[in-house]
Amino acid sequence: MKKETKEWSQIAKDDREIAIEMWKTKRNVYAVMFWQQAVEKIIKAYIVESIDALPKKTHDLDVLLKQAKLDITKLPFSNVKELSLAFTRTRYEDLSRKHYMKRSVVEPLVMMAEKLYLWIEKQLK
């Protein structure tokens, strides 16, 4: 595994650990924000390792998945747009209150992010 891949993977792992802790402590806004970041960074690790390219400087998971040439259509979800939006929305108090205060709204995003993260991590090994 390349040095840069290891760095991206470690940052992704750290973000995942924070996301899990935030979810356990019912800090929904931070949970979804860190899950989005964990997924973004594990995709970037995959791009560095498998595509041998620099990942695009974006938070848009669709763009990164396309660059990585990862086909998620066989996963139980295929629309990661809402998870991509989460990073931007959580950065603004009015948007984070509007979208991510209810656990019932955040839970599907957390579950999707965890499945996607683990699937991409498996592709890396």
Task: Report each predicted region and the residues it spans.
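Terminal alpha-helical segments
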Residues: 1-125
